[in-house]
Curated annotation (Swiss-Prot):
<keyword id="KW-0812">Transmembrane</keyword>
<comment type="function">
    <text>The central subunit of the protein translocation channel SecYE. Consists of two halves. These two domains form a lateral gate at the front which open onto the bilayer between TMs 2 and 7, and are clamped together by SecE at the back. The channel is closed by both a pore ring composed of hydrophobic SecY resides and a short helix (helix 2A) on the extracellular side of the membrane which forms a plug.</text>
</comment>
<dbReference type="InterPro" id="IPR002208">
    <property type="entry name" value="SecY/SEC61-alpha"/>
</dbReference>
<comment type="similarity">
    <text>Belongs to the SecY/SEC61-alpha family.</text>
</comment>
<dbReference type="InterPro" id="IPR026593">
    <property type="entry name" value="SecY"/>
</dbReference>
<keyword id="KW-0150">Chloroplast</keyword>
<protein>
    <recommendedName>
        <fullName>Protein translocase subunit SecY</fullName>
    </recommendedName>
</protein>
<dbReference type="InterPro" id="IPR023201">
    <property type="entry name" value="SecY_dom_sf"/>
</dbReference>
<feature type="transmembrane region" description="Helical">
    <location>
        <begin position="209"/>
        <end position="229"/>
    </location>
</feature>
<dbReference type="GO" id="GO:0065002">
    <property type="term" value="P:intracellular protein transmembrane transport"/>
</dbReference>
<feature type="transmembrane region" description="Helical">
    <location>
        <begin position="72"/>
        <end position="92"/>
    </location>
</feature>
<feature type="transmembrane region" description="Helical">
    <location>
        <begin position="309"/>
        <end position="329"/>
    </location>
</feature>
<feature type="transmembrane region" description="Helical">
    <location>
        <begin position="146"/>
        <end position="166"/>
    </location>
</feature>
<keyword id="KW-0934">Plastid</keyword>
<feature type="transmembrane region" description="Helical">
    <location>
        <begin position="122"/>
        <end position="142"/>
    </location>
</feature>
<dbReference type="Pfam" id="PF00344">
    <property type="entry name" value="SecY"/>
</dbReference>
<feature type="transmembrane region" description="Helical">
    <location>
        <begin position="17"/>
        <end position="37"/>
    </location>
</feature>
Length: 436
């Protein structure tokens, strides 16, 4: 592939690479352009890495902006409003029949309308998140007033819409999905800080070499697991009406090549994103109840309850709750990505059947069974890497396994985007080779 990249007959690919790198670099630089009234002292007090580790929204912002909130700038809100808007539109298409019809039956026109809806919703979410961030800064900005509030919000909204524009340019004229590449690039840009943070943490721990070996081993194992789960597929053999009419043995042999490939990682990283939002909601609800009532203080007044509700009890309870949410959202999002009813209907329209399975309800039941199996494997993989690493971290007293927020989420995003980008580059090279 390197030889092909150096070939002068690949100007379009080179232009795509240059455009992608240029826009990603501009976005990264833009995250360091100061927002009015937000100084370094403000960031240290509110948005530093140490404080953000206990704030789920800050963790999400860290993941999707690559730690940009440690140097909060004009473009630091980044692609997060667009991610939120895309999730909501995906959910609404499964709930609202008109949107579902627009997506499935109206072709390119329907897809363009959904893209427009996503843009409008992105603008709305940019307003909501910018106002929320501005309001959270009121306690650490000395000269707080409505003008400061307005300028900070306006700056973040403008930056978010610029990032959305760049993302669409990359998707249309660059190397791949713009939002995914932006997230990936920001995560990679923050790796030096993460490595530095890890080395500092190791200095304060006993058996440094064993910890380093353990960290590297865990990183390699999880990376291999991410690659495997991302590339693994289940092949379901298909037969069309045209193939059934073929009589010769050679044709029957060739007809077995038609398959429906179902990825094991159907839901991708979205179950973890949904889970993070759910944790954010319940954490906020807990804080509101705690401030407004003294119900939790009443519980801890009793010695028996105080001894039972220990640190480890709460930790285990949280892990069970976390794992349950991941399992639920993996099943939920898998049905959004691949609806067995829709697949069975498309098979019926195209006169295609699954080998050995009757069309109609039998096909739908069979696909639902396969989808449940896939979702179960995917959920176990995510739970093992998220909860398992947290348990190992607590038992071994290691503070570096999940570096700064959603470490495994970032790792899974990196693997998915890098594999997809390599495939797209190969596809562009093959297209240009055939063209010339």
């Amino acid at each position: 592939m390197n030889t092909k990249l150096q070939d002068s007959k690949s100007p379009r690919l080179k232009n795509r690479i240059l455009l992608t790198i240029s826009l990603l670099t501009i976005v990264r630089i833009g995250s360091f352009i100061p927002v009015p009234y937000i100084t370094k002292e403000v960031l240290v007090n509110l948005l530093s890495a140490e404080n953000s580790s206990n704030n789920t929204f800050a963790q999400l912002l860290n993941t999707f902006s690559g730690g940009g909130n440690s140097s909060f700038g004009l473009l630091s809100l980044g692609i997060l409003p667009y991610i939120n808007a895309s999730i909501i539109i995906q959910l609404l298409t499964t709930i609202i029949p008109a949107l579902s019809k627009m997506q499935k039956d109206e072709g390119e026109y329907g897809r363009r309308k959904l893209v427009d809806f996503t843009r409008y919703l992105t603008f709305f979410w940019a307003i909501v998140e910018s106002i929320s961030i501005s309001y959270s800064l009121r306690e650490v900005i000395f000269e707080w007033n409505l003008q400061v509030y307005f300028l900070i919000s306006l700056s973040l909204i403008t930056g978010s819409m610029i990032v959305l524009w760049f993302s669409e340019l990359i998707t249309k004229n660059g190397l791949g999905n713009g939002s995914s590449l932006l997230i990936c690039f920001n995560i990679v840009s923050n790796l030096p800080d993460q490595i530095k943070f890890s080395l500092i943490s190791l200095k304060n721990q006993i058996n440094n070499f064993s910890n380093i070996f353990l960290l590297i081993s865990i990183f390699l194992i999880t990376t291999i697991g991410c690659i495997y789960i991302n590339e693994a597929i289940i092949k379901i053999p298909l037969v069309s009406a045209r193939q059934l009419l073929k009589k010769t043995k050679s044709e029957e042999k060739n007809s077995s090549n038609s398959i429906l490939p179902l990825r094991i990682n159907q839901a991708g990283v979205m179950p973890l994103v949904f889970t993070s939002y759910a944790i954010l909601f319940f954490s906020s609800l807990f804080e509101i109840i705690k401030k407004q009532t003294n119900i939790f203080n009443i519980f801890f007044q009793y010695p028996i309850l105080n001894s039972v509700i220990s640190y480890w009890f709460l930790k285990i309870l949280f892990w069970i709750f976390y794992a349950t949410l991941i399992f639920f959202f993996t099943y939920f999002y898998s049905t959004i990505v691949l609806d067995p009813k829709d697949v069975a209907e498309r098979f019926r329209k195209n006169s295609v059947v699954i080998l050995g399975i009757s069309p109609g309800s039998s096909t739908r039941s069979y696909l639902s069974k396969i989808l449940r199996f896939i979702a179960k494997i995917n959920a176990i993989f995510l739970i093992y890497n998220i909860i398992g690493l947290q348990i190992l971290e607590s038992i071994l007293n290691l503070n570096i396994i999940n570096i700064r927020g959603l470490g495994f989420t970032s790792q899974l995003i990196l693997v998915n985007v890098l594999i997809d980008t390599i495939k797209r580059i190969r596809s562009f090279l093959n297209e240009e080779e055939n063209y010339f």
